[in-house]
Amino acid sequence: MPKSGRDGGASKDSKYDLSKISARVDRVNVSGLLRTHNDYVMRAADGLFKASNFQDLMLEAMSTKSYLHELGIFKDVSVHIDVSRGADASPQGYEVTFKGNEMSRMMGSAGTEIGQNEGSLRTELTIPNILGRGENISLQGSYSSTRANDLQLKFWKPFFHTRFKENRPEMSFSIFRQTDRFDISSFQTTNIGYLVDFSAHTMVGVDLTHSLQYENAIRDVGLLNKSVPFAIRDHCGPKLASLLRYSVVYDNRDGNVFPTRGIYLKSVNEYCGLGGNVAYTSSTAHGELNVPLFAGLVAQFCARVGVVKETKNTTQLPISSLFYCGGPLTLRGFKFGGAGPVVESTPIGAQSFWCTGAHLWAPLPFAGVFKNLASHFRMHFFYNIGNNNSFSTENMRSAFGMGLAVKLAERARIELNYCVPVRHQDTDRILNGFQFGIGYEFV
């Protein structure tokens, strides 16, 4: 029997350097393709044929498995690696087989969805892989009792199987009906139209996510009550908006909700006036910097800025495209839209705004005892500063406080803060005390 221990030839703790075991892939099989065309998965094996040792083979096999999942055609994928057999087998050859289980011809789902300071009920009916190369058709509907309701029919086409697969190009066409309520200003907008979207990644120096959209929609502004100022009534009625929208995102954070390090940058630019009777340009930018300190403490600095301007074809800036500053996602200590210009005590939105936030995040005191539970909670101290229709520090608003945040599945968070407004204007709607917020992008 072999000995165990330092002098033995075999040990339960023996380790092998897989990078020193020569290996090459002779053949790759993908089984389970029922409705999918073969050329859609052909490029999945590109990395496997470059493997020169067993460690590379294992890593590339896992990468290929992830790639097959991203194609959007399989429920699950399993990997089998076996020695290569047959007359054409090489001495260190292996055969890799991926067994996939294709998605059903029709799928449905229902659940909740987190938006910016709102939650909604969402249902979706999807026909996946309809043409055999990852194309999807989906009918989506969402309902919220607070702000927005949506109905959307969407056709989505990925191009992951092309030679540009590393760029993850995607294209979609949507027909939508969207209703947004602005209770603070007593109006709502109903948009009916279509949207064409093309998105891709670029990795020249840094990894950026780009999205280029064309939207054509009828925007109808309606009133929620009779006692609305004329400045808002003047915007009522349907108008046709035709616009281009470009957005770019850079994100190297180590987490979406409670990051400990990294930078997040996002920019959205719109040009409206390609047709119809609505014309303007709009730009918004959001930035976030996270710096680890000690004992689990993290310093976070956030900023957001937005500007909407007239063009030579502008007759009136649409009220739904103006900025509403204030609320738990921008300026804590103020009600939603409560830090901005007003007409007859009614907020009407601003053509520009800026706000910043400094945070000190800390784990809960008992984080070491209840590790799994405590990882979903954080305490923070914050100080927010902002203003609208002016980029100076005169007449700016500010507030500080502390609160508790809860993570929701790495996608959003809930905050319960105690806020103390420091600087505000007489017409502002302040909130001195507890404030509740839910969303995925905070300042």
Curated annotation (Swiss-Prot):
Gene Ontology BP annotations? mitochondrial respiratory chain complex assembly; protein import into mitochondrial matrix; protein insertion into mitochondrial outer membrane
Task: Please tell me the species this chain comes from.
Answer: Drosophila melanogaster (Fruit fly)
* Entry remark concerning the domains of this protein: Its C-terminal part seems to contain many membrane-spanning sided beta-sheets, that have the potential to adopt a transmembrane beta-barrel type structure.
Q: Which GO terms describe its cellular component?
A: mitochondrial outer membrane; SAM complex
The record's section on PROSITE patterns has: POTRA (PS51779)
What is the role of the protein in this entry?
May play a role in the maintenance of the structure of mitochondrial cristae.
State the family named in the UniProt similarity comment for this chain.
Belongs to the SAM50/omp85 family.
Q: Which GO terms describe its molecular function?
A: membrane insertase activity; protein transmembrane transporter activity
Gene3D superfamilies on file: membrane protein fhac: a member of the omp85/tpsb transporter family
Alphabetical list of PANTHER family matching this protein: SORTING AND ASSEMBLY MACHINERY COMPONENT 50 HOMOLOG (PTHR12815:SF18), SORTING AND ASSEMBLY MACHINERY SAMM50 PROTEIN FAMILY MEMBER (PTHR12815)
Q: Which UniProt keywords apply?
A: Membrane, Mitochondrion, Mitochondrion outer membrane, Transmembrane, Transmembrane beta strand
Report what the protein is called.
Answer: SAM50-like protein CG7639
Q: Tell me, how does this one assemble?
A: Associates with the mitochondrial contact site and cristae organizing system (MICOS) complex (also known as MINOS or MitOS complex).
Q: Where in the cell is it found?
A: Mitochondrion outer membrane
Q: Which residues form the POTRA domain?
A: 23-101
Q: How does it sit in the membrane?
A: Multi-pass membrane protein
